[in-house]
Amino acid sequence: MVILMIKIGFVSTIDSDDLVFEEAYKEIKKYGIEFKILDYKCSRKEFEEFLEFIKEANIVFTKLMGGKNAFKYYDELAEFCKRHNIPFLPLPTISEIHPDLEKDRTVDDDVKNKVVKYLGYEGVYNYKNLLLYLANRFGNLNVEYEEPRPMPWQGIYYKGKYFETLDDYLNYLKELGRDLDKPIIGVLFYRNWFVANNIDYVNDLIDIIENKGAIPIAVFSSHLKNELGSIGTLETFKRFFYKDGKPIVHALINTTMFTLSMGVKAELLKDEPEFLKELNVPILQGIISTGFIEDWKKSVSGLNPIDLIIGMAMPEFDGAIIHFPIGGKEKIKDGEVGVPIIKYRAIRDRAEKIVDLALRYANLKLKSNKDKKIAIIFHNYPPRNDKIASAFGLDSPESVVNILKEMKKRGFIVDEIPKNGTELIKKMLNYATNDKRFLTEEMIKKAVGKVKKEDYEKWFNSLSEKVKQELIKNWGAIPGDVMNFDGELIIPGIINGNVFISVQPPRGFGENPSAIYHSPDLPPTHYYIAFYKWIKDVFKADAIMHIGKHGNLEWLPGKCVGLSNECYPDICMELPNIYPFIVNNPGEGTQAKRRSYATIISHLIPPMTISDLYGDLVELEKSIDDYYETENKEKKEFLKKEILKKIKELKLDEDLLDGKVIDEEINDENFEKLLNKIHDYLETLKNRQINDGLHIMGVPLEGDKLVNMLFMIIRYQFNYLEILAEILDYSWEELNENKGKYHKILDEINEIGLNLLKEYMQYNFDENKIDELKTVKINSKLRDVLKTVSTIYKNLMKVDEEIINAVNALEGFYIPPRVAGAPTKDINCLPTGRNFYSCNPQEIPTKSAYEMGKKLAEDLINKYLKEEGKYPEYIGVIVWGSPTMRTKGDDIGEILYLLGVKPVWNKMGRVVGLEVIPLEELGRPRIDVTLRISGLFRDTFPNVVELIDEAIKMVANLDEPDEMNYVKKHYREEVEEKIKKGIDEKTAKETSLYRIFSDKPGCYGAGVSHLIDEKNWESIEDFAKVYVEWGGYAYGKGYYGVEAKEEFINRLSKIELTVKNEDSQEWDIFEGDDFNSYHGGLIASVTYYSGKKPVSYVGDTSNPNDIRTKHLKEEGKEIFRTKIMNPKWIEGMKRHGYKGAADFSKYVDHMFAWDATSGIIDDWMYEKIAEKYVFDKDMEEFFKENNPYALLNITERLLEAIERGMWKADEEMKEKLRKKYLEIEGMIEEKL
């Protein structure tokens, strides 16, 4: 027998095929066939070895999911085959169409069609005959082969058996004596793994489900319908998860990747996946990692970037509850086909845990509501009595009252419904709380729970040795000192029927303040662990509900994503986690989803309105109007003096950062300039978006609040005001260029806009009544906007679904998904009450985001150039995850454009590369940018981190003059300097390009807020040292979390300009501590390490048609005037009793913090705070009645500002504040 040498090459993205081809090749290699597979993730060396192999190949074919872009060497491969006359058949996976592959095909249609069938049907039989067919067709082999044969496309798998119908399977289980009345858990896995017999992990899941007393239905399928026999997701669900037209499963563990909806027609999906709503069971995402289990175990990041996208981000589009890897790859052997042979194996403890959780979700569906126990957890940061129920934009106590009402209505045992949210908190304050200053013996005595040492010891002993050692090292012997009274750990909160309402334990930095300086990865306390174990094992909760943005559980140390049993969020979270969360914060909501397995229930933002002017600001505007309108010279001169006097009294000249107005320096010309600036500024202050109180879950807006909210949503997003101006024959561009001059016209347009909406409201926003509206002439553009208003209104009226779905989740229902976003920028996030998702990281930045980023960069550079007379060489930028998700990458676009680089997108809108913008096109130097990214951004956008790092390296290595490329200039200087110091060239080059810094892997935050909250600082040196300790880790392509504190200090010492952008006015920089902790911390660090305070900007894109780059201090003054001192804002907050007072306290905390780091609060501002919030009689009564702890904290903060020299108050003020503090403290203690 003559042995022929036939060579066949194959490039694949589907590694489960490798095992099948290995088995197939064993049977046919005797015919002299050489067959090699090249994995799409191959190295350059491996690719070149493959080219050497295929030089004399008879044919090369591919199976590339995603087309040519999936394989980085594709073009080289196609060119190589063409050059060497090798028949080339590039194919995607079945059901994909990629014309870019088709154009490179050099074999006939009949060959392609047959190969597609062999590859589509899969299995050893088909792959063996595929290779024989190709060897016969292209290698002159004369051996019989079989035609492609269909293999099962979908079905039920059970312990080596395959069932075509649900009835066949259930009948088989009955024959085995199984009790079908038990909970039924669905498992979904890929058909190709079934055909490849690569299902060890599925066998394990089946065993675990049965061992825990439930019935498994393990279904294999392909997401996409095809002509070869796949019926697709929708029909698969109907065939195997329904019986007699009703769902038979109680929970579903999905182990497939991407999105279940990808194979379902758009009309069946509508806005939300209707087929999943009909199934109506929780979908638990059990991730089967594309990486090796051993790598995951060792990894601090957890999952690899591919798993993050296809195993987490995309399933979130389905409303899946994201969990952890329950399986991954294990290498079986080195294959004869050129690649290692792998199998997917279970990670046993993770598989056990996901089944436990699936059973707990099934239990929510099966158990009677009257028998369920629910824990409701308020956040409490800082852990003080004025800040119980801290949640952004939400009246969380009132919302919980509404949740309790709905629970009682549905049969949950709730003994009493509090009169309102304030009464609920007052009741909680009668029991133990986290604020140890006010814990009395009586409170400790009547605590709802006490954990003895021996009880905690059982929980403690269930932890791994590593975790036990960490806890003991940081918190001492069990059960620790935190919340330990007479040897027992006290559980705060109240029990109301079958509902436990409590406060989340503190993170731990208050209990160990020195750890802020050296241990950002400080583990939670023994008490923290005990609290969550007590809820599960003693209170025996069926589910937990965390209320509002955001707690600390999801930020505890551990792997970044894809947690193990040694990660602290995983240790604590063993129950279904329902999490109402503000709709405009996708990033931190995503953190809760991925690190505490939360089902998000999105809630609306607070009611929004325009700020308006008040008090002396109104009078000043009138005086300016009078000045412009009068012809009388004497009156003009009088008004001029009055205007100057009022400007100085109100300190408005300081707001504009032009220095104080000095009468002697004022002449007619500069007075007119000043007047124009002040007039424009008043218009800005008048029209800033502010919240009118807080949102209450489930409560629809009505009347003026509804009209104002609709107005704020449409005014910029749909160019509402511009359309009205056009109808009224005004030039919108001219009006905006001279806002002060034309403010009366702008006011008129605003008023008409509001009146039109009020009139429309009389018709319940019925779009069929648009032509009956009389307020203004309706043109086609306005008609379209009003039709959109009708849709927005309907979605706002679905706000009751926030409460409905929160309680639905407690009944084990499916919560449908919807994209997160800021409603005033993107109405697609409405309605709320949804399990929101964020974005596809591969699309960041989108084309529109890059264009917005360009505008931001140009505005920033132009402002700096105008003010400083030069280009900034070094810029420090703060980059967060949530803004990136909301804007789809504005900040990333800005950074790339500062560097002089633009992304390359493929046809699907995914970023696939970078392109340098030539200097002649750029028209300016390339700016050197240092990023401080949040831990959340690091975790959610690893691909973007690598993209920016790649851009930096590209720019640093360009052949351009130093004066036109600051990155290259600084890189060259640093490398030379390091080599002189004896550092080797490789290290010098690598470290001199570190530009992206973040937290230590598995850690989060900037540390500065903890220092301020614990009063654990003396000067900006402390902030700088903590900022570097927490953020001194470098990230980029090829390195992850490298400790680089000296490099970070080096960058900080050279930064001239800092910036953090804000894309909406639904929040502001005084609303949360992270704004200051990151940006303020950066400013303090630059000031300390450089010896000079940097210029600091805020890029405001809240109105995308009018981007404004402002000085940080300007932004602070705007917020101070439009919110903190604005009666309209104050009265709105006061309506919310305890929570409104808590938020007043929060704002003063954060103003103080900004002043500590960045010096942006002037003495007069502190004085105004004292006058309004401490000494105003009405406010004092409000605080005393609703939340005296808030008044105590505000007074304490003001005294601290004086003591630290931040506020140069006189002795009289100091004494008044001291007296007030002692008075309030005495009042509180008297009531305890």
UniProtKB/Swiss-Prot annotation:
InterPro entries in UniProt: BchH, Cobalto_CobN, CobN/Mg_chltase, Glycoside_hydrolase_SF
Pfam annotation, one family: CobN-Mg_chel
Gene Ontology MF, one: cobaltochelatase activity
Cleaved signal peptide residues: none
GO BP annotations, alphabetical order: chlorophyll biosynthetic process; cobalamin biosynthetic process
Family per similarity comment: Belongs to the Mg-chelatase subunit H family.
Name under which the protein is recorded: Uncharacterized protein MJ0908
Organism the protein comes from: Methanocaldococcus jannaschii (strain ATCC 43067 / DSM 2661 / JAL-1 / JCM 10045 / NBRC 100440)
